[in-house]
Amino acid sequence: MSDILDRIIAVKREEVAAAMRSTPLEALKLEASARDRRDFVGALRAKHAAGQPAVIAEIKKASPSKGVLREHFVPADIARSYAAHGAACLSVLTDEQFFQGSVRYLEEARAACDLPVLRKDFIVDAYQILEARAMGADAILLIAAALDTPLMQELEAYAHSLDLAVLVEVHDRNEMEQALTLKTPLLGINNRNLRTFETSIRATLDMLDMIPQDRIVVTESGILSRADVDTMRAANVNTFLVGEAFMRADQPGEELARMFF
């Protein structure tokens, strides 16, 4: 792992330990059991069935590599705007220290619309998956660069037992081989290298030959223009996770519509 990823994972382990002391597992299970569920994978497939791109629209205030992306940041308004302009699902950053995210942002965004929501965070422990369910998330992210294969498989199984969808994220062919051992249909290819933070959409295009037909390829990071979208769709990649391009726009939902529809 890179220095930045090492640092993030170390912080996550500390956060999990603190959260477990604050909210015991049984209490969290009660919260999780009270939440309704929205079909994350089904929402993506419905867009595909209609011949449309499926956009997982991200709500992200900042990132370690780009700093603050959006000063005027009202998650509920952004969520409504995305829903009104054709998003299939939402992705909400809940990491506080590195991305200025919040659990509250996810709760506010989900309450503001009917779209399924991905908890975007660095998952290292099953406790975080139960947290995701308790806060209302419909899907979680597993990052191959941060997890070994047995742990990733264990975390996926636990997520599925809670009826959460799993998006597994990779950046290179070795990580893709690891991801293909999972059952989830959602394969995210991060065009940003978490070791160097360099970005190229070639990362997605160069791995398409590895992916079985029954999986859904989600291209992540570096999709900044209609030309990038057209390049991906020409390669039969029709599912996108986009944050920065929308967050930097005056009207995030309108930018989504301009780029994709």
From Swiss-Prot:
Pfam families: IGPS. GO terms for biological process: L-tryptophan biosynthetic process. It catalyses: 1-(2-carboxyphenylamino)-1-deoxy-D-ribulose 5-phosphate + H(+) = (1S,2R)-1-C-(indol-3-yl)glycerol 3-phosphate + CO2 + H2O. It comes from the Bacteria. Keywords: Amino-acid biosynthesis, Aromatic amino acid biosynthesis, Decarboxylase, Lyase, Tryptophan biosynthesis. InterPro entries: Aldolase_TIM (IPR013785), Indole-3-glycerol_P_synth (IPR045186), Indole-3-glycerol_P_synth_dom (IPR013798), Indole-3-GlycerolPSynthase_CS (IPR001468), RibuloseP-bd_barrel (IPR011060). It comes from Burkholderia multivorans (strain ATCC 17616 / 249). This is Indole-3-glycerol phosphate synthase. The keyword Ubl conjugation does not apply. PROSITE patterns: IGPS. Gene3D superfamilies: Aldolase class I (3.20.20.70). Its EC number is 4.1.1.48. Coiled coil: none annotated.
